[in-house]
Amino acid sequence: MHNQPGPPRPSPRHSRRMRCAAAALLLLLLGACAAPRPVPEPPLPYPPAARQRMLRIALAEWMEWGGVVVAPGQRPPTARAESDPANFPRVLAYWRAVPQDEGAVALNRRLYAAALAGDPQGAALWQEPFWSAAFVSYVMQAAGIDRREFPGDAAHSAYVDALIGDAARFPATAPFLPRGPFEVSPRPGDLLCADRGRVPIRDWRERAADQGRFRPMHCDIVVEAGPGHVDAIGGNVLDAVTRTRFPADASGYLLPEPPGAPAFFAVFENRLGRLPPWRETSP
């Protein structure tokens, strides 16, 4: 019985070339893993008109939902609920302002069709997912504020992290600066943010410990402030766009929230129109 010849053995020169190629590929992969993330471009300044438009849009949306004003925790006598089919295009516009809608549009198109057909399932229109962050994102986008300066998102925590990161990297030009909720008196255009979790953070600096993980939050847009009160408009508040009148002291500083209410953790100072070459100082 004769032995069958095996496959030809690679030459030493070929083996060396293969080893060198493998080593080069490994170094390339390691280099790619170690490459630093690109530094984002600095944010651009905006004219005062951007903040003014932001406030006009927030106020107009609030009026379209019935112009309801409540104190924290209070329920209004009447409100135009999100489940009213007449409000379908309003909330749809908010969701169209975020890059990922979490399936909200597809789900609620089906519920809208059910409501039009008299199907009881239509009563759940716009109940899920929560749309408060989409509302804030819509106001910013409609005011002409680009995603670089305000990256709208379906989750408040995502854009909160982006604003905190911008303030750390570009403190001189960041359009929004995080402040402690009781360190400053809020002004129109600022964002007032609260933690809705069971173990809430009490200061925006504590957010770093989450390392980007989702945290239930809610942010409102301050539209009026003065001695004794801070008025802020938010979406998905009592199933509508609602204006909440938060108590403040004689100097306009927020008073601590009542027990059981979401915990304030930040006021994001709005610097649109307040950075060079613009120097507007009025509200």
Model-derived features: positions:
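Short, solvent-exposed loop/turn and secondary-structure capping segments
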Residues: 70-73, 150-152, 204-205, 243-245
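Short loop/turn segments at secondary-structure transitions that flank enzyme active sites
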Residues: 64, 139-142, 146, 198-200, ...
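C-terminal motif of bacterial Sec signal peptides marking the signal peptidase cleavage site
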Residues: 30-32
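Residue-level signal for mature regions of secreted extracellular proteins and peptides
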Residues: 26-27
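...with weaker cross-activation on analogous glycine-rich loops/strands in unrelated enzymes
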Residues: 152-238
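Bacterial N-terminal signal peptides that target proteins for export
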Residues: 2-22
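N-terminal capping segments
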Residues: 37-150
